[in-house]
Amino acid sequence: MLAVVSPAKNLDYESDLPELNVTQPRLLDNAEELVEVCRQLSPQQLGSLMKISDKLAGLNAARFEEWQRPFNENNARPAMYAFNGDVYTGLDAASLNSEAIGTAQKQLRILSGLYGVLRPLDLMQPYRLEMGTKLDNPKGKNLYEYWGDSITQMLNKDLAELGSSTLVNLASNEYFSAVKPKVLNADIITPVFKDEKNGQYKVISFYAKKARGLMARFILNQKPKSVSDLKEFDANGYSFNEAMSSDKQLVFCRAEQK
């Protein structure tokens, strides 16, 4: 099976890395085209477009200016180790063993507004460009129009290489909307993580994001072969809830966190 996750806004280009066989992003020509579009915008325009502070807008304008090919280990960092949000706290790439890292390179993909689809060991230079950004570009009015079928076709290629017809969706709606289910050669399985709050089970964003990372880690370490194997996930107190689940949506519940 192939799993997809969202990227993170926060980045880590400081911490130590293990020895890794890094790779190049496969849609770099597209990324370069988008960087050129973003370079035409002033920091103020970027700030307005992305709804970020002047300080962050200045930082990201500078990142687009400094972005350059070729990528190497001095100017870029493997994607799985560069993102630093709640999903990546759950994934905890720094503690994965070499076998799990190898599995990740085959079975985990990171969706990206700038790079399209990243493998975990693909080098990336720092950026901020969320998939939902309404960026005018040569192919349309937003990034969904820009990427079109390209992301889905790349996932199809990865699924074919795995000999798999199952895609595990661990991404947010914003990012997974860049995947075209009608073009995808796979069944989509979406794990949902619910936490108890005042006697009700509901999705709490902070916990759910971390749980998606934990599920990605489970896939890399346990190598589930089937959807039923995914139901064995029990990290951090979550357990599969048959009654709330359906064929395509696996619901995991957890008692209230005290």
UniProtKB/Swiss-Prot annotation:
- Give the family, as the similarity comment puts it: Belongs to the UPF0246 family.
Give one Pfam family, short name only: H2O2_YaaD
Q: Name one GO biological process term.
A: response to hydroperoxide
Q: Which GO terms describe its cellular component?
A: cytosol
Name this polypeptide is given: UPF0246 protein IL2146
Recorded hits in HAMAP family, A to Z, give:
UPF0246
Which InterPro entries does the UniProt entry name for this protein?
A: YaaA
Taxonomic lineage of the native organism: Bacteria, Pseudomonadati, Pseudomonadota, Gammaproteobacteria, Alteromonadales
Q: Where does the source fall among the domains of life?
A: Bacteria
- Can you name the source organism? Idiomarina loihiensis (strain ATCC BAA-735 / DSM 15497 / L2-TR)
Q: Which NCBIfam families match?
A: PRK02101.1-1, PRK02101.1-3
